[in-house]
A protein has these predicted regions:
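Alpha-helical substrate-recognition element adjacent to the catalytic core
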Residues: 2-126
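Amphipathic coiled-coil/heptad-repeat helices and related helical stalk/stem segments
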Residues: 83, 147-150, 169
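Alpha-helical segments flanking ligand/cofactor-binding loops in enzyme cores
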Residues: 84, 88, 155, 173-174, ...
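Anion (oxyanion) recognition and catalysis
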Residues: 91, 113-116, 158, 177, ...
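Acidic, Mg2+-coordinating phosphoryl-transfer loop and its flanking beta/alpha structural elements
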Residues: 101-102, 161-198
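Substrate-recognition "cap/lid" segment bordering the active-site pocket of phosphatases
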Residues: 109-162
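Short acidic-hydrophobic, aromatic-tinged amphipathic segments that line or gate anion-handling sites
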Residues: 200-207
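Short amphipathic alpha-helix with an adjacent loop that forms part of the alpha/beta core around
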Residues: 210-214
Length: 214
């Protein structure tokens, strides 16, 4: 028996111990890395809306295809301890697993495959490249680049309930009105405004498994 039939998972600092766009920013030097990290922290604590920073960061970072491929490997290398095993057990109990992320889809898809999450259940921001792998832009229409975009996306999916959302940031916490529970994940980053609003607080995937499976 399961307590939740669907689980919506954040990626950066939840499924994997990396903030993808900040990692890409680090390739542009310490100053850009610090600037990007500051914006991420403020957005994840709900101090600034995500749409106020997303396009600006991407316009400066401008990741190449090869850098996205390198980031893909880092997502897998830094996967949260116990995540593979816990998610495999949830799948065995027919729990629907969904990734909803403000990260870059092409970098996240290999991690989804590694964790057994179907490609059509990965909601993230697509990035575009030219014939030589140079950055040409990102999907500016993506709901993931907007405040409350995750909430809208999850609502439109009409997942089988009860539904649990899991994440470390305010953009994850904001899903709460359209799901049945929200778990703040603190295994990589603890953000007090998120913890204060959470129904549950977990710091590892064994706890997630116990929460979902009765």
């Amino acid at each position: 028996m399961t307590r939740f039939n669907s689980v919506v998972l954040d990626v950066d600092s939840t499924l994997s111990g990396v903030e993808g766009i900040d990692w890409l920013a680090s390739l542009r030097g310490a100053e850009v890395e610090a600037w990007s990290g500051s914006l991420t922290a403020r957005a994840m604590e709900g101090l600034i809306p995500i749409e106020a920073v997303y396009g600006e960061r991407m316009g400066i970072v401008r990741p190449t295809l090869s850098e996205i491929q390198e980031l893909s490997a880092i997502y897998i290398d830094r996967v949260a301890p116990g995540a593979r095993e816990a998610l495999a057990e949830l799948r065995e109990h027919d729990v629907e697993l969904v990734m909803v992320s403000g990260g870059l889809r092409e970098a996240i898809l290999p991690l989804a495959k590694e964790l057994g999450i179907r490609e059509k259940r990965v909601h993230a921001v697509s990035v575009f490249f030219g014939s030589e792998g140079q950055y040409t832009g990102f999907d500016e229409r993506s709901l993931m680049t907007r405040q409350h975009g995750k909430r809208t996306t999850v609502k439109e999916m009409a997942l089988k309930g009860p539904v649990l959302a899991v994440g470390d940031g305010m953009t994850d916490c904001e899903i709460r009105p359209v799901v049945d529970g929200f778990a703040a994940f603190t295994g990589f980053m603890k953000r007090d405004p998120v913890v204060e609003r959470a129904d549950y607080v977990i710091d590892n995937f064994d706890q997630l498994r116990s929460l979902v499976l009765e």
